[in-house]
Amino acid sequence: MFRLWAKIWKSGRMIRDTVICNEDTKLNRTRKIFSALEEVCIEFDLSRPIWLDSNIAEFKKHDKVRFGRDNFIDEIDFNYLEIQVIEEDE
């Protein structure tokens, strides 16, 4: 099973979180990440964040990335959205 944990942070506090699960073995890792991020954005009522080169590098290194104001087209009322892969398919 693939699980992604998404958290919204504001003023140093986590104000909202969710875990998205994906059991579709036909999808590769990248598609699972984008699918989970899409579900997160729907649940949190956010526009999809833009992946900058720095976000991609951070995610490749740590399986975790933060999306701040620069990553969203719309105005956001929090400091950042953090996503982290917490379980991967074997």
For the regions a language model picked out, list residue spans one by one.
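A structural signal for the main folded, soluble domain(s) of proteins
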Residues: 1-3, 22-23, 75
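Residue-level recognition of well-ordered beta-strand positions that form the cores
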Residues: 7, 19, 84-86
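Short, flexible N-terminal segments of the mature chain
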Residues: 14-43
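Amphipathic beta-strand/beta-sheet edge segments enriched in Tyr/Trp
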Residues: 4-6, 11-13
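Acidic, low-complexity intrinsically disordered segments
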Residues: 34-90
